[in-house]
Amino acid sequence: MAKNDNELYKGLDDLERNKGESNYLRGTIVEGLNDPITGAIAEDDTKLLKFHGSYMQDDRDLRQERRKQKLEPLYAFMIRVRIPGGKVSTDQWLKLDALADNYAGEQIRLTTRQTMQYHGILKRNLKKSMQSIHDAVLDSIAACGDVTRNVMCNPNPYQSDIYAEVNRAADSISEHLLPKTTAYHEIWLDGEKVVDTKKEDHEPMYGKTYLPRKFKIGIAVPPSNDIDVYSQDIGLIGIVENDELIGYNVSVGGGMGMKHDDLRTYPQVGKVIGFIPKDKAEEVCEKILTIQRDYGDRSDRMQARFKYTVDRKGLDWIKQELNDRLGWELEEAKSFEFEDNGDRLGWTEGSGKHHYTLFIQNGRIKDTEDFKLKTAIKELAKVHKGDFRMTPNQNLIIANVDEKDKPEIQKIIDNYGLTDGKNYSGLRRNSMACVAFPTCGLAMAESERYLPSLVGKIEDLLDEFGLSEEEITIRMTGCPNGCARPALAEISFIGKAPGKYNFYLGGSFKGDRLNKLYKENIGEKEILESLRPILEQYSKEREKGEHFGDFVVRKGIVEKVTDGRDFRG
């Protein structure tokens, strides 16, 4: 490496060097894939692989036993598909379902960003899996990494025309902000190789080192905030007048991740800075992204998210810098009102079509002896003439069903015992968990495998106090990275150690306020003992229509938090 290149990365996080020297995300990934000695790839390449939509993981349930046997960890890979707005055709679903059968343990995991991911893919099957995604006319480019992640939008089963428009916007923003490197096609799809500097790849928007950290964009359409718009780096809030989408309020600087022992880190809610016409969304997102590219902290990844750039520079500075880059000014924000951040479960109707939102607990699609969920959805895909939409709450919408086809869809739903969640408590319907153990390397505690059981024990308390039908959001993550957006929930648990969680209360049912630490590093017994008197008090003293999160704030059980800088104080 030349001396001036050494100077280029001096004082920066080492990942900046890795990205900059990677030849636009190639690194030595191909060599690693072809190495038969290990199930892993090189450490630097694992960082680059994220930009291709994949993480290297290992089965943590087996780590100790394999160590005893003097074996390397059971390495496998997760692939996350890029699906802006979460919409797939039934033909695409069938191909993605087959991928799970062939390479991923016959399971699909719906994510909190309206896409799907596969776990347990062995290195020898990684390229074949990527090609299977390509066969479904999809890809996994930028599903992970320091780039714009999967662009979300409100599925709006009851406002189909508006949904179609915001889904097109999500598609267009995603395509516009996609990395331009040809590395993905070269490595996974046997595209033409860039072999010398005379034909060097390029990244006109991102540059060689891409963004300082991941960058998330989502479009919400009031009254539903199901995408948790305030958790996004850029949130676009659709403004509808006379049944027509006229534009978006723009929110900046949201983000959920933090680190337990780094008090400089915190979750944050985005702040609205103005209104834009709908045809300006792509341009505005690009300019905001370039502000983060130029001013985000590349020396400390714990301070590299856009939320810290916004808080460090100030909202007024961000708005002025955006106006300067655009060459025109944002308008004053328009009024809007959110009602909730959940899904419309069961049958809904809009624009002459019917839509059924299927409740899928924590997004896990697999067959068990008693519940053939994966098979059921495959059977639906074989006969359904509309499309499927993955929701931000890890559920699945069977969308665009004609009146004449409703009985056939309902018959499959009934035959397989599928549910709209209405047979469950309001708490379970609004529950969400990240994957955590055994595949996530960051997990400090269980999440997906534990939350259903904990919810069952909390349901006993809800039954006791007559609260079973109350809609209450509850979320759990195995670490503080925030994949299930726990800091926005009315009740949340963030893993601290095996069996131990930080317990938070006071988020908003609308998703527009952060919760607050109530008790630290506690287990199940203390969780239930702590919740009992609060739920009892809520049952007796709540005002009409008052949500649980609002109640605990009004009663002073926790402080109201509307800015992440007050989250820890």
From Swiss-Prot:
Entry keywords, A to Z: 4Fe-4S, Amino-acid biosynthesis, Cysteine biosynthesis, Heme, Iron, Iron-sulfur, Metal-binding, NADP, Oxidoreductase
Cofactor remark: Binds 1 siroheme per subunit.
Top EC category: oxidoreductase
GO biological process entries: cysteine biosynthetic process; hydrogen sulfide biosynthetic process; sulfate assimilation
EC number: 1.8.1.2
Disulfide bonds: none
Alphabetized Gene3D superfamilies for the sequence: Sulfite Reductase Hemoprotein, domain 1 (3.30.413.10)
Reaction equation(s) it catalyzes: hydrogen sulfide + 3 NADP(+) + 3 H2O = sulfite + 3 NADPH + 4 H(+)
Molecular function, one GO term: sulfite reductase (NADPH) activity
Coiled-coil blocks: none
Residues holding [4Fe-4S] cluster: 434, 440, 479, 483
PANTHER family: SULFITE REDUCTASE [NADPH] SUBUNIT BETA, SULFITE REDUCTASE [NADPH] SUBUNIT BETA-RELATED
Family: Belongs to the nitrite and sulfite reductase 4Fe-4S domain family.
Entry function: Component of the sulfite reductase complex that catalyzes the 6-electron reduction of sulfite to sulfide. This is one of several activities required for the biosynthesis of L-cysteine from sulfate.
Annotated protein name in UniProt: Sulfite reductase [NADPH] hemoprotein beta-component
Organism annotation: Staphylococcus carnosus (strain TM300)
Classification of source organism: Bacteria, Bacillati, Bacillota, Bacilli, Bacillales
